[in-house]
């Protein structure tokens, strides 16, 4: 895996891109993004869904719609990683909509765009909801 996708490129999506660029090429999709961010390739939804790992970085109020909209378009073996600030609700949504052959890693970032900019030290709580292909271990170490 040499690239990852990010759906949602607001403040937190940009922080994710900064963190992940150290090890991956980044593809991003956002309805409102201008498509300009150093080192990020902006693609349409169809192309972002080809990535093996996709981070969902949308506001919680849009989370269920995004997950339900993409669920039927995901290929077997893809892993979805959410970065919502709450856990029960996103996990329930992902388990409800995502096929059994799609991995799920629920995370709770212990930083935000402002705190990351001040100390540049990301820390995440992670829940191995549905691990496929040992993705949880990989991302826990990253």
Regions found by a protein language model. Give the residues of each.
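Rossmann-fold dinucleotide-binding core
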Residues: 86-142
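Hydrophobic/aromatic beta-strand patches that form the interior of the parallel beta-sheet core
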Residues: 27-29, 43, 81, 105, ...
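Active-site beta-alpha loop architecture of Rossmann-like, nucleotide-cofactor-dependent enzymes
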Residues: 35, 61-64, 87
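Short, conserved loop/helix-junction motifs that constitute active-site signature segments
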Residues: 71-77, 97-99
């Amino acid at each position: 895996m040499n690239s990852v996708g990010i759906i949602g490129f607001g403040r937190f999506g940009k922080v994710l891109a900064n963190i992940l660029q150290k090890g991956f090429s980044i593809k991003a999709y956002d309805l409102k993004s201008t498509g300009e961010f150093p080192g990020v390739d902006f693609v349409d939804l169809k192309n972002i869904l080809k990535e093996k790992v996709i981070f969902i970085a949308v506001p919680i109020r849009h989370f269920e719609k995004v997950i339900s909209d993409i669920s039927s378009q995901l290929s077997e073996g893809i892993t979805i990683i959410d970065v919502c600030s709450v856990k029960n609700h996103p996990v329930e949504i992902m388990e409800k909509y995502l096929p059994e052959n799609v991995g799920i890693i629920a995370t709770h970032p212990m930083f935000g765009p402002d705190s990351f900019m001040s100390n540049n030290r990301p820390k995440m709580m992670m829940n191995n909801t549905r691990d496929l292909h040992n993705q949880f271990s990989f991302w826990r170490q990253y």
